[in-house]
Amino acid sequence: MGSSLDLVASFSHDSTRFAFQASVAQKNNVDIYPLNETKDYVVNSSLVSHIDYETNDMKVSDVIFFGWCSDLIDTQSSNIKRKLDEDEGTGESSEQRCENFFVNGFPDGRIVVYSSNGKDIVNIIKNKKEILGADTDESDIWILDSDKVVKKLQYNNSKPLKTFTLVDGKDDEIVHFQILHQNGTLLVCIITKQMVYIVDPSKRRPSTKYSFEISDAVACEFSSDGKYLLIANNEELIAYDLKEDSKLIQSWPVQVKTLKTLDDLIMALTTDGKINNYKIGEADKVCSIVVNEDLEIIDFTPINSKQQVLISWLNVNEPNFESISLKEIETQGYITINKNEKNNADEADQKKLEEKEEEAQPEVQHEKKETETKINKKVSKSDQVEIANILSSHLEANSTEILDDLMSGSWTEPEIKKFILTKINTVDHLSKIFLTISKSITQNPWNEENLLPLWLKWLLTLKSGELNSIKDKHTKKNCKHLKSALRSSEEILPVLLGIQGRLEMLRRQAKLREDLAQLSMQEGEDDEIEVIEHSNVISNPLQDQASPVEKLEPDSIVYANGESDEFVDASEYKD
C-alpha cells in the first residue's frame, strides 16, 4: 500500500517492517517500525527509526508511491557490511537472509531506495519522464511513465530489465497501476476511468489478456486459485469468472480502498477503516473486523505461510498491530480488536478530571447538561419508525417538509445511519436529502442544531461514491457553496478559539489580581501595626531628651538625629 492523502502506511512483503507517517503535510519524515511476531508485534519506541527527507532536500509530501522490495543478501560477502538491527537478532547463523528496501517514487521521475531501517540510501534511479504509477514485486520495481511506457527495474540497478509501451489505454487517463499474480504468473493491471486492462508482460510483445468495461475502478486482485478476478469500484466489489468468458457472477455493495486475498477469503479494507471478508458463492460478508472506540484500520497484509493476517490500526497518531488467524475470521462473524481495559480506565480518569474542572465553571456545566439532555433523551421505537416512514413518503412526494423531517427530535445517530443505508436506495432521494442539508448548513454554518451535521457526516461517509457519481449541475453547485461556507467557518474557528483563550486568560488574571490585592491588604495591615509599635519605641526617649537639634513643627512631625528638611551649615551655626 502507498500513501492515502496525508497518511503513509505500508507493510513490507515479509511483514517485518512497517513504514508510517500520520501527517506528511506537517512532518517531513517517515517512521520505520520493526515487527516481530515473538513480541506480539509490540514495538518499543526506541527501536523505531526515522527517515529525515529534509537532510537530502526532499519532501515526503511529494512522494506518489511508497512500497517495499526484498532480496536475499549474502551475509558472508565482504562487499556487504550491514549491521543487523538489535530487534532482528535471533542468534542463528545463516549464509543468507532476506533484506527489505523501502522504495519511494517521486513524480519528477526519481525513485529513491532506502535500506530497511531508512538510515542509508541504497540507490537513486532517475527516469527521464514523469512517473504516473509504480508497484513492487520481490526485488523488482515496475513503473509507468507519462509516455505510457512500462519499465521493469531492479532496486539496486538503474538500467531497465524490461520495457514496453502500452497499446490498450495508451490514449486514456490512467488512474491506477498495479502488479498482480495469477497462479504464479505476473501480470500488469492498468485502470482508466472507464476500463480495466490486464496485460501479460512475459511475451516478447506484451498483450492484453483481459479487459473489462467498468467505471471508477480503484483496485483489482485475482482469487487465490486464479479462477476469478475481483474488481472494486466506488460502489461495489465485483467478481468475474474467468473460466466462463469473464462473466460477472457476484457483487457486494461496499466501498473498497485496498483489496487482498487469503486462501479463498476476499479481504477488503473499506473507506471507513474496517475489513470486510467475503467468499465466492456467499451473498453476505463472512466476517467484519473493526477496531474498538471507532478507531480505523490503516493497512493490512495477509501472511499465507502462517494462515493469518497482520493488521495495523491508528491510535492517537501511532500505529498499533495485531494478528488474526484465518480460523478466527472463518468462525466468527464479527471481530473487534483493541479491547483494552486500561484504556477504558484512563478515559474514566480523564472524564473525572474534566468533571472536576467544570464544577468551577457553572456556565460550562449548565451548557454540558443541556447538550447531554438533547443527545441522551429517550426516543420510543414507534416514534423512530414513524419519522422514518414520514421522511420516506416526503422524499417520494418531493415535499417541502423534508428539512423539518430531518431536524425532528425523534432521530438518533444509529437511526440516521440505518436510514441512510437501508432507505436511501435511489440517486434521486440521495440528491434531495443532500441538497436540503447543504442549503441549510450553507445559510448558517454556525447553527447549533446538531442533527444536520450528523446527517451530512454519515451521508458523506456511507454514500460518498453515489454522491460523486451525481452529474446534476445544481447538486455540484450546492456542493461548492457548502465547501465555501464550511471553509470560511473553518478559518474563523481558530480565531474564535483564540479569542476564547484570551478571555479565559484575562478572567484568570483578574482573579489573580483580586487574590494578590487581598493578600497585599492583609500584609499592609500587619506592617502598619509593626511600624506603629516600632515608632513608639524610638520616639518616646527622644521626647524625654532636650536635644538642641530637635524641632517641633506645627504638624507635630518629629525629626530625630538630624533628619530635617532644612540644610544647616555647621560653621555658620558655630559663629
From Swiss-Prot:
- Provide the protein name: U3 small nucleolar RNA-associated protein 9
Role this protein plays: Involved in nucleolar processing of pre-18S ribosomal RNA. Required for optimal pre-ribosomal RNA transcription by RNA polymerase I together with a subset of U3 proteins required for transcription (t-UTPs).
Biased composition, Basic and acidic residues: where in the chain? 340-355, 364-375
Miscellaneous remark of the record: Present with 20000 molecules/cell in log phase SD medium.
The UniProt subunit note reads as follows: Interacts with snoRNA U3. Interacts with MPP10. Component of the ribosomal small subunit (SSU) processome composed of at least 40 protein subunits and snoRNA U3. In the absence of snoRNA3, forms a complex with other t-UTPs. This complex can associate with pre-18S ribosomal RNAs.
Keyword match rRNA processing? yes
| Annotated Gene Ontology cellular component terms | 90S preribosome; nucleolus; nucleus; rDNA heterochromatin; small-subunit processome; t-UTP complex
Record's superkingdom? Eukaryota
By its UniProt entry, which SUPFAM superfamilies does this protein fall under? Answer: Tricorn protease domain 2 (SSF69322)
Region (Disordered) residue spans = 340-375
Q: Does the keyword Transcription apply?
A: yes
Annotated GO biological processes are:
maturation of SSU-rRNA; maturation of SSU-rRNA from tricistronic rRNA transcript (SSU-rRNA, 5.8S rRNA, LSU-rRNA); positive regulation of transcription by RNA polymerase I; tRNA re-export from nucleus
| Gene name linked to the record | UTP9
**Keywords (A to Z) from UniProt:** Nucleus, Phosphoprotein, Ribonucleoprotein, Ribosome biogenesis, rRNA processing, Transcription
InterPro entries the record matches:
WD40/YVTN_repeat-like_dom_sf
